[in-house]
């Protein structure tokens, strides 16, 4: 059976062609997949949910004219961590309704906190840990409300940033993923939608077997291990909205 996958997001989705790495991992593991995407740098899910927006119209067109099995949703990387959770929640609600009408399964692509030294952390009075926790909390809250799957990429990034910083999961901008980080992203997406451990996948992205092994173990832990969300960051999305009732 062939699986049709659509990615909706921004540069965190298309950086280093991580969607293509995902496809190659799937194919190497005997999973037949078609991969499609609607992405634009810096975009929010609010824009992707707006049919009057250029890319929002593309999302609507894709969902109208194609049949998908899985659709990944990736929010602008700061929005859920800087007090704009309601806009994030509303967009996920709207897109989830459209995706389910297509017959597909929505999956949230949980992103990560900026690397230490990022100007954005200073600007918003965040740390790598606090930004990570806020993102995990927001993605988890709307996932619980709408009964969604979450691809816990941010969880794995935090794990490796703390425990294996020498492997450099970040690009030089302290925001986007390095090539190693993009491989990690792809592994987690694969494990999430197929409910299969990524340890020992056939596709060899790195000639460095040690780095590949670390990525596979971190991906497995993020998908199948316990949540790292701390109690003080736990939240609910119920009733949190920017939508004005008539």
Protein language model features and the residues they cover:
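Mature, Sec-exported extracytoplasmic domains of Gram-positive
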Residues: 2, 41-45, 54, 78, ...
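Conserved SGNH/GDSL esterase-like catalytic core that processes O-acyl groups on lipids
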Residues: 4-6, 12-89
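Alpha-helical cap/lid subdomain in secreted, periplasmic
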Residues: 60-179, 191
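Conserved catalytic region of serine esterases and O-acyltransferases that act on ester linkages
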Residues: 169, 176, 186-246
